[in-house]
Amino acid sequence: MFFSSKKCKTVSKTFRGPCVRNA
């Protein structure tokens, strides 16, 4: 996952991918 913790939080709203799974 190349998504940063900060970006994940902001992207998680529109992008529901590995970020939410990792969180």
From Swiss-Prot:
Antimicrobial peptide. Active against Fusarium spp., Gram-positive and Gram-negative bacterial pathogens. It comes from the Eukaryota. It is found in: Secreted, Cell wall. One of its GO terms (biological process) is defense response to bacterium. Disulfide bonds: none annotated. Keywords: Antibiotic, Antimicrobial, Cell wall, Fungicide, Plant defense, Secreted. Coiled coil: none annotated. This is Defensin D4. GO terms for cellular component: extracellular region. The keyword Chaperone does not apply. Distributed in the epidermal cell layer of leaves and in the subepidermal layer region of stems. Not in roots. Belongs to the DEFL family. Group IV subfamily.
